[in-house]
Structure formats: C-alpha cells, structure tokens
Swiss-Prot record:
Gene Ontology biological process terms, A to Z: cell division; chromosome segregation; sporulation resulting in formation of a cellular spore
Top-rank lineage group of the source organism: Bacteria
Gene source species: Sporosarcina ureae
Keyword Cell division part of the UniProt annotation: yes
Protein name: DNA translocase FtsK
Oligomer status and interactors: Homohexamer. Forms a ring that surrounds DNA.
Extent of Basic residues compositional bias: 1-18
Gene Ontology molecular function, alphabetical: ATP binding; ATP hydrolysis activity; DNA binding
Residues noted as binding ATP in the record, renumbered to the chain: 465-470
Length: 780
C-alpha cells in the first residue's frame, strides 16, 4: 500500500513542477526583453567602455546606419515580450525592417564609393579592402565626422551586386530591396494599394483645380466692388495737425525698423525727381559748345582702333600640367586626427570640420569648442608644426566670414598653377573687363582674378627669388591678352634691365622700356603731366572720370559724325623701386605720391615692385596712398609688417606663394601665383608685334639726362690749391687746411670742387685722394 501511495505522489510533483515552469516561462521572455532594451540604450548613448565598444562594433557592421542595430534589438525585445516565443526573428515586421536596412546600407555604400572615386582616393577595385581602409586604417569607426557608407555589411552587399550588375545595377537592386521591405513592413500588396488609392488622389486633385479656377473667374459685380475697395484704400486721409504736434513733442525716439521703413519710402518717392534733375544737369554739362571742339585738348596715347587687330589666344600659352596629389589625400585624414589629438593634449577641445587641399598648402578648418579662446589656438603654432612634422604652419584666426580657425600646412609636393588655366577659368571673369589680371589660385583651388581699376594701385614686395617678377609678367600678360593697344597703354620702368626688356616693341607701350634710373624720375613726371592734362579734359567736357569721358566721346562722335579716339587706360609698372629711391628718392616719391592720390579717376594705375621692403624704400607716404598689397616670402616679420601692416609673409614658402591684400579687405588671402615662362611671354609678344608695331608718344619718352658738373663760383684759393696738389701729386682736406690756414669747411669745399672738375679722384677712406691731373695737362 505504501508503494502505491508513493507512485501516486510522484506524478503529482511532476505536474506541479511543470505548472511552475509554465508560469515562469513568460517571465523569462520579459526579463530577456528588458535586458535587450537595456543593451540597446547603452549602445545608443555609448555609456562606458561597453557602450563605446558596442557602438564601434555597430559602426563596423552598419557604417553610418549604426543606430539601426540598437533599434532592431529593441524591436526584437518587444516581439519577445509580446509573442513570448523565440522565433520572433522570422516575424514579417522584422524581415521587412531588415530588407529596408539592407537597401539603405547598399545606397550608402554606392555613395561612399562614388565619393572616393571623385576624390581620386580609390586605390583598388576591392570593395572590402577599401571599406576596411576607411573603417580601420583611417580610424573611421571612432571618428563621427567622416562618411562610413554601409559598413562591412554594406560592403558585402555592394561587392555582390557590383560584380553581378555593376554600380548602376546596385542602385536598382537597392530600390527593389526597399520596395520589398515596405511591402513586408506594411503587410499590404503594392499594386492593389495603388489601384485603390489612385482614384482617390485624382479626385482630390480635380477638386482643388476646379476650386482654383472658380476663384480666379470673378463676376462683374465682384470686380466693381474690388475696384471701389482699392480706391478707398488709395485715397489719402486728411492730416491731423494735433497728432503731428503730439509726435513732434514726444521726446522718445522711434524704433529702428520704423525709421528704416520711413526713410525707404521717402527715398522711393523723391528718387525719380532727383534722378531726372541729375540727368538733365549731366546732359547740360556734357553738351559741348561747338566753338570748343574736343581736339583742343589732345590726349597723349590716344589712337584710332586697329580693326584688324586680334587679341592673343590662350592657346599660345602652355596647357596646365596635371600634378599627382594622391599622396596628400592619404595624409589629410591622419593629419586631421593628429590636430584634434594635439589640441586635446593641451586641454583645447576642437573638431576639424573641413579640409581644403590647395596647390601649395592644405587648409584645415578647426571649430573650437564653446569657451575656447582663439589666442590659445594661435599660441600652439609651434606645437602643431611639431606634431605634423611640417616645416612651418600659418594660422588664420578666425577665417573671415566663418566661425572657424584656419591652419595652413605646406604640401609635400607643390602643384604648379599655370597662367592659362587661371585666364580660362569662368570664376569672376567678366569678358568686358579690360584690366582684369590673373594672380593664381587660392587655398581652396579657386582661380583668383582682380580688376586693376578697382585696386586701383598695387605694391608688390618680397625677397629675391620669391616670385615678384613672374607675378609682374603675369599681370602684364593678362592685360595684353584682354585689351587692344588703343584701350590700354603702358609705361614700364626696369632698372634691372633684364626683366621687362622682352616687352620692348609691343604696341601697348607709350615709350621704350626705361632702364636708366636717372630717366625713371623724368618718366614718372611725364605721367604726372599726362594726368594733369586729363583732368583739364574732364573739366572742359564736364565729366568726372575716364569712363564718363569715353562715353562722352562716343556720344560726340555719333552726333557730329567724327572719329575722336577714346582715352586709353595707362598702367605704370616699376619693377624695382629700391634702385630708383637710391638715385632720386625725392623726385620719385613725389611723382608716385601724386599719381597714387589722384590718378585713379584719370585711368592711370601703378604697379610697384621691390625686393627690399624697408621703410626707407616703401615710405609711409607711398604706403598710405597704395591700398592694395601683394607680399611674397620675406625674411622677417618686420618686413611683413612693412608690406601688409601685419605678420604672415615671413611664413610663406616662396616660389609664387603670396598674400594678397586688396583695398578694403580686413585680412589677406593666400594665393599660389600663376607661373608664366619666358617662352610663353616671347610667343605672345611676337604675336602682338607681328600685327602692329609700337607707336611711341614723343611727349612720353624721357630725354637724355646730361650730367653737368656744378660750375658755381670757385674759391679764390682754388687755383693755388690745384697747383699745389698737382705739384705734390697728393690731396687731402687736412693738407689744404695746414698750407693755406683755412677752416675745415672751406678746405672741404675746395676739394669737392676739384673732384667735380676731374682734378682729384673720390675719397678712399683714410688715404689721400688720387690726383688725376698731371703738370703737363695743367700747363696746357
């Protein structure tokens, strides 16, 4: 009996255990769901080492769609908690989400490889290798700024579809995956849904279209009501004088928007009358008296247009040489990481937002964190150069127009910029601008061109071999290739005798290239006289500048059927100012100052270059009147401040690397100058000379400078002193002092007179002067 009772109790215990297990099974699913949701939250917010590790693993798998993994985990957890069974991964919603995710990964990877191909960074055809390089080699899984595509899963999908149906087919496959995912996610077939919804959509469109047409068609009665309403609105209201007095007595000023709006209305109301008055006055002023023809005031350099003249083509210049900068692309990501780590090691939190690869330097745009002083970033220049192993860096803090700091790092290989590619660029290149000159390309690679008549004068300075003469040649070539000889004339002064002589004979010259420094001051004075003569013309014709005068000449020619020449622009080019300042500093400085102050309206522009940017060459008066500056590499920050009124030029690389500070700009722009070879210059010059010979203006050619010895009244002891010096064959001031018992000033004056007349030679330090005259010549 006892055994039978034990057998009966055993099944009862098993049933109780099974009952407890069946009650606990839903709780396990609840616990599993809660744990999965917790893991997903840790992944999303990257809590601790586990969160960051899971997030990095998610980026490795899914790339830029790494957030989808924790959300898929949350969806799976909810299915566990609701369905209370394993196998939820086969659920229709989960499968639909996976299809949609796969399409997004494929789209992202197609875009990633298009970007890599356009950036010329793609080194192989293997999608898996290139993705591994982006994710692991370049530390992409820890960098949240760059694009990662679809991760390794996206790389597998892209590699599979690319090998089967190419890149375009991979995009089509992505669309198909997206449609399949939407169908599975919604649980509705696509075609029946479209068949059901299309008529409803078409009816809505028809109703809206009919309502719009009905609203646009108005009855005659409605039109009359609208016209009456508009008349009542436009009818002026009577002015209440009491309100005006109250406004006048009110001392509180009106708010700024009201004042602005009120002023704009007044200007709009009174502007037509003022414009008509100005036009009538201008017509009265510009109308010449028939008794005073235009030819009473001839313009130097004016000539009739040679209609057969053809501008030189850009094909005469060498085509740009393609440069390989693939090595620089590999360094960009690594240098960006080094910059962020270097700043972080000094307690400065920053982020690299943008990188510009230029011809000579790479510019990294740094966005500092809130509360970081710009001065702290600038003070770390040497540490940044050490971290990047760079020869020298330049920091632009801040970048004008941006809330970022620019760090310019020299490239390992400098890409040459040709003048042809700059002149052929479509950026800032109006065809009607005759004085548009090409300078080069900036850090972002954009062609930099500027109009000389807007500068209006430019000072170019830099050390020897930094690229000044090439820049001057590029400016001259730009003008020759855009302007005909009757439109622009030039006066060239080249004391070095080798830089500008190649342009001798071109029809744009007013006079042959001036190479004698003593004639240069005279040439500048001739240009000043031409400027004064032009202002007399402006006064006579009632115009204010060269553009107004040329418009007046065209109107005069049309009205009187005459052909008076237009007034040409004049560009004065001085290749070495230091030599001129040594020979005739006062005359040169006065002429340059007058031209810089007044010549802009007369159409005369200065281009002055020097390799000695010191204060005795670039004086304060010259700097004050020449607003635009171009600085090449200099030896010290003092020279940079002399040119730009600020440091920066001492960190340039040379070979055309320049800082361009146009008039009105707050900070200079870094440019890699355009290179033009001697062969290109000769080709263009020969092409121009073959079409038209130079017609020099006699009034602008400097005359021979005669060196006349000063024949002032000689000292009464002069003849005796000469006789003594010739007899003794030696001469000195102290000897004349002792022999004739005179003071030092009188003795020195006698010796100077002897030197001026060729009796004695120049001083040789502490030695006596050498006597040039012999006794036989003296007796003759």
């Amino acid at each position: 009996m006892a055994k039978k009772r034990a057998k009966k109790r055993a099944p009862a215990k098993k049933r109780q255990q099974k009952k407890q297990q069946s009650q606990m099974q839903p709780l396990w699913f609840e616990i599993l769901g809660v744990v999965l949701i917790g893991i997903a939250i840790i992944m999303i917010f990257e809590f601790g080492i586990i969160g960051r590790g899971l997030s990095a693993f998610s980026r490795f798998l899914l790339g830029n769609w790494y957030v989808a993994l924790p959300f898929l985990i949350i969806v799976q957890a909810l299915i566990f908690m609701i369905k209370r069974q394993i196998g939820g991964y086969k659920h229709r919603i989960v499968i639909g989400c996976l299809f949609i995710l796969g399409s997004m990964l494929l789209f992202s990877h197609v875009h990633l490889f298009q970007t890599l191909y356009e950036s010329k960074v793609l080194m192989s055809n293997s999608a898996l290798k290139e993705t591994w390089k982006v994710l692991i080699t370049n530390d992409g899984i820890h960098d949240q700024t760059g694009t990662l595509g679809g991760g390794m899963l996206g790389a597998v999908l892209f590699a599979m579809f690319y090998s089967l149906v190419d890149s375009s087919g991979a995009t089509v496959a992505g669309v198909l995956l997206l449609l399949i995912g939407i169908i599975l996610l919604t649980g509705k077939a696509l075609i029946p849904f479209l068949v059901e919804q299309t008529p409803i959509l078409m009816n809505d469109i028809k109703k809206k279209w009919a309502a719009r047409e009905k609203k646009s068609v108005k009855s005659p009665e409605e039109k009359r009501k609208e016209s009456a309403r508009s008349n009542r609105k436009s009818k002026p209201k009577p002015v209440d004088t009491s309100e005006m007095e109250a406004v006048q007595e009110n001392p509180e000023p009106a708010s700024e928007p009201i004042i602005s709006s009120f002023t704009a209305k007044i200007e709009q109301a009174t502007q037509p009358e003022i414009v008509q008055e100005k036009q009538s006055k201008a017509q009265e002023d510009s109308t010449l008296d028939p008794k005073d023809p235009v030819t009473d005031y001839p313009v130097m350099g004016g000539e009739q247009e040679n209609e057969s003249y053809v501008l030189p083509s850009a094909k005469l210049l060498e085509p740009p040489v393609a440069s390989d900068q693939s090595g620089e692309y590999d360094l960009i990501q690594a240098n960006a990481k080094k910059l962020e780590k270097t700043f972080l090691s000094f307690g400065v939190k920053t982020r690299v937002t943008q990188v510009h690869l230029g011809p000579a330097v790479t510019k990294y745009e740094i966005l500092p964190d809130t509360g970081v002083k710009v001065s702290r970033i600038v003070s770390l220049a040497d540490d940044i150069a050490l971290a990047l192993a760079a020869s020298g860096i330049r920091i632009e803090a801040p970048i004008p127009g941006k809330s970022a700091v620019g760090i310019e790092v020299p490239n390992n290989a400098v890409a040459m910029v040709s003048l042809r590619e700059v002149l052929e660029s479509k950026e800032n290149n109006p065809p009607e601008a005759k004085l548009l000159v090409g300078l080069g390309r900036d850090v972002t690679g954009q062609a930099m061109m500027t109009e000389l008549n807007k500068m209006p004068h430019v000072l170019i300075a830099g050390a020897t071999g930094s690229g000044k003469s090439v820049c001057v040649n590029g400016i001259i070539m730009s003008i020759i290739m855009r302007a005909k000889p009757h439109e622009v004339k030039m006066m060239m002064i080249d004391p070095k005798m080798v830089e500008l002589n190649v342009f001798n004979g071109i029809p744009h010259l007013l006079a042959p290239v001036v190479t004698d420094p003593r004639k240069a001051a005279q040439a500048l004075q001739r240009v000043v006289s031409e400027m004064e003569r032009r202002y007399e013309l402006f006064s006579h014709t009632g115009t204010r500048n060269i553009e107004g005068y040329n418009n007046h000449i065209e109107q005069w020619n049309e009205d009187h059927d005459e052909k008076h020449p237009r007034m040409p622009y004049i560009v004065v080019i001085v290749d070495e100012l230091a030599d001129l300042m040594m020979v005739a500093s006062s005359d040169v400085e006065d002429s340059i100052t007058r031209l810089a102050q007044m010549a802009r309206a007369a159409g005369i522009h200065l281009i002055i270059a020097t390799q000695r940017p010191s204060v005795d060459v670039i004086t304060g008066i010259i700097k004050a009147n020449i607003p635009s500056r171009i600085a090449f590499a200099v030896s010290s920050a003092i020279d940079s401040r002399t040119i730009l009124d600020g440091a920066g030029a001492e960190k340039l690389l040379g070979r055309g690397d320049m800082l361009f500070l146009p008039a009105g700009a707050s900070k200079p722009t870094r440019i890699q100058g355009a290179f033009v070879s001697d062969e290109e210059v000769e080709a263009v010059v020969n092409f121009v000379i073959e079409q038209q010979k130079a017609q020099y203006q006699e009034e602008m050619i400097p005359t021979e400078v005669e060196v006349v010895a000063p024949h002032e009244e000689t000292d009464e002891l002069y003849d005796e002193a000469v006789q003594m010096v010739v007899d003794m064959q030696t001469a000195s001031v102290s000897m004349i002092q002792r022999r004739f018992r005179v003071g030092y000033a009188r003795a020195a004056r006698i010796v100077d007179q002897m030197e001026a007349r060729g009796v004695v030679g120049p001083p040789e330090g502490s030695k006596p002067r050498h006597v040039l005259l012999t006794k036989s010549k003296l007796e003759m």
